[in-house]
Amino acid sequence: MGKTTTALNISSALAILGKSTLLIDTDPQAHSTISCVKNPSQHNNSLYELLISQDNRVDDYIITSTIPGLKVIISRISMAKLEPTLLGQIDGHYRLKDALSPIRKKYDFIIIDTPPTLGIITLNALVASDAILIPIQSSYLSLEGSDDLLETIDKIKKVANPNLRVLGILITLHDRRTNLGKDVVSKIKNVFGRKVFRTIISKSVKLEESPAYRESIFTYAPHSVGAIQYKQVAKEIIIRAKN
């Protein structure tokens, strides 16, 4: 349970809390898309077409999700072809930022779900963003890649997006019953300090099941611990975004 589960459920929580929210799925696996959009294959316009065509009519690519108040720009497998295409373009890192320019002030929050690798699609997301939320699973191995990500963020700030900041570190898949889980949380807090969100996402059967049923936690188990915790995280995000 990591970035896609977090992006989907935080977007859903923000919408449920009354914030106008847009979720952008940039991952070729399209897990966010299939979890909150009915019959996504019936929609012709995806993020791939938007970025390839450099169409400035971004509203034509925004569709309604199964979560009230949550809008989506969908992804599909064709996004995998975008990586080599953008690598050969002078403006390759800026396509997403340019595409979102007309609607940035239209939404309270625009959440971007990224691929699992630090390729040019993820770099597009970092260039287009004001802030980044980093989910870290409650295990020692999950800390290993954090240094590379933070180094990439620093490079992006210096070269392309000086306003980019780390909004927070979200601990997920936490087992409160084990000493190991407690030790990892302590380690993460020692490394990242006040950047760590107060709310910790517990390991949960419902949270692990919801992607298999192609749903967010709010449509699959709206009264579960996972839903309550993600809503608490969303409230923290609203506060931090104001600062």
Set out the residue ranges of the language-model regions.
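P-loop NTP-binding core
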Residues: M1-N243
